[in-house]
From Swiss-Prot:
GO CC field: cytosol
Function description: Activates KDO (a required 8-carbon sugar) for incorporation into bacterial lipopolysaccharide in Gram-negative bacteria.
EC number from the UniProt entry: 2.7.7.38
Catalytic activity: 3-deoxy-alpha-D-manno-oct-2-ulosonate + CTP = CMP-3-deoxy-beta-D-manno-octulosonate + diphosphate
Pfam family, one: CTP_transf_3
InterPro entries recorded: Cytidylyl_trans, Nucleotide-diphossugar_trans
Subunit comment: Homodimer.
Protein's name in the database: 3-deoxy-manno-octulosonate cytidylyltransferase
Organism of derivation: Escherichia coli
């Protein structure tokens, strides 16, 4: 059985809530909560965050996650 890869889109410049991926929720950025839940999915080999903002990329790397930059 092959393993799945989860890619989480995380855009910093949202029109309704700018900076949402970095919004602090009980001491962690929102993107970290999402990332940690994705790691719990059965059959997942890797989790990546796709972002167009270096602040999000650095936050993901700070908690040990994997991030890839996209064009904005």
């Amino acid at each position: 059985m092959s393993k799945a890869v989860i890619v989480i889109p995380a855009r910093y410049g949202s029109s309704r809530l700018p900076g949402k991926p970095l919004l602090d929720i009980v001491g962690k950025p929102m993107i970290q909560h999402v990332y940690e839940r994705a790691l719990q999915v059965a059959g997942v080999a890797e989790v990546w965050v796709a972002t167009d903002d270096q602040r999000v990329e650095k936050a993901v790397q700070a908690f040990g996650g994997k991030a890839i930059m996209t064009r904005n």
